[in-house]
């Protein structure tokens, strides 16, 4: 045998033997698989032996036979000795709570239905998935029972896995038990081992900047969710969270022990009573980055259906902020809103006094403010406008139950929650309960600062939007703005607070115009930091006047993360398209095959043009086109284009 052939055999053995050993380590009867309805996703679960009696749970995920998640741990970390002692249950002595769980059964089911949201990015949403429930038991003996109270050292846990064509999600579920099981969750073992060479769009906090970083060298830093990743084979992956209502916020940290591995990092511990389900951990994969955007309904599908009996009062729309807290100035804002096709006026912080003082009373107007809110509500209603107010969480925590009936009596339509604390179990539960209560009084909600959505607006659609984004309050550049559609907006609506005339904006006016089509927010704040008198009849602002804030259909047509985005949205028969580029100029060819075949349209096109002798330098073009025509958009650096297609009769 020659040396070359011998080297090849040795190399083959080095590759095969570890694989065989791994296969032998998998415990008999624990391997379970689940595929998506179209067969693209394959989720594989199994347990490996740890010592003589224990086991560790693992999973892998492939997409079209390409590795997405390599062998990764599953599990929940529970420290239950105090509860067990109080209940007279023998203490659990396992190093990791999940290590002696035994798989006792598996249930499978399928679902395929279509539902209509109260509002959204699409008029109908298909909810189609395959589901697998893995059932586990911890403990053996029947133990002692006292007066009907079960003192057996038995615990039960399920892992529920759903495979959609849009992605895969799993969660931990603790069934109800006769011993009224208390659980003190101190962490999760949930991890995501990515292919070597994966890059992450790292974001340290919800309103922070993004950085494309390898899965190494993060130290103790954590990244926000959603976390979008670029795999070395070109796939785009997003890790998200769904139905986080009374749990704690999860972020992502790097494993100290295993390369290219992300771990779920919980904000703090959680105390629960069974039955209880943890939030869904969601994995989406796209061959193109825009596939992630087009599949974002998965987050809503993982949440319960609407629980409000009457939703007729919930009216999405555009919002103008009034920072001038004087009666006549708010009236001027209402007049401007009525003129410019805006549905709401928002009275910002300070109307009831210094917002950061616990003594400020949000049931009354500050003595130094010339404001009569009930009279303003009546004036706004006469103009077809709704009035909303800002209230800091400091006042909400103390006065919420008093404020809600009062604000309804005044005629207010909504509240913006300000400087909301979010992360631990207490504040997560409080916040979602506050949204529920607002729904009982017919008040819409916009949550500001660090809160990020996980689909609660399906269940309580009076939660219209939320910040949790580096928007125009931070004045980000075009690079940041072209990352957002592929990251933050995957989780749901975001209140970016669109600016237009403000001189601190770093991007072109056409870039800002396009945001109204690219960025989804059922309450879309426009002209942030502007005043009514700033408007001088600019023709391009007819785009903002015409555009709605919710849609019958939405399609991300083209783009690359941090480079550019082309987003099309339909309301009725009209289509609106926004194109945005990063800090580099580029030419984008737009094929209008999203339009109805055989129909002709009038196109209103708004583009940057530095040659114009106007202050906004936006060129307006109006021309007839037919479905399928190609349009060449020359986007200026940090620029964009806004397009409105209206069918011709």
Per-region residue spans from a language model:
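N-terminal accessory beta-strand-rich subdomains and adjacent acidic, glycine-rich linkers
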Residues: 25-302
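Aromatic- and carboxylate-enriched substrate-binding clefts and catalytic-loop regions
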Residues: 349-508
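Glycan-recognition and catalytic regions of carbohydrate-active enzymes
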Residues: 134, 531-576, 611-616
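Solvent-exposed beta-strand/loop surfaces of large extracellular or lumenal domains
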Residues: 123, 144-146, 202-210, 605-628
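C-terminal beta-strand-rich structural cap/linker in extracellular carbohydrate-active enzymes
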Residues: 623-649
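Carbohydrate-binding surface patches
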Residues: 561-597, 641-642
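Bacterial Sec-dependent N-terminal signal peptides
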Residues: 1-29
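An acidic-aromatic substrate-binding cleft motif
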Residues: 276-344, 348
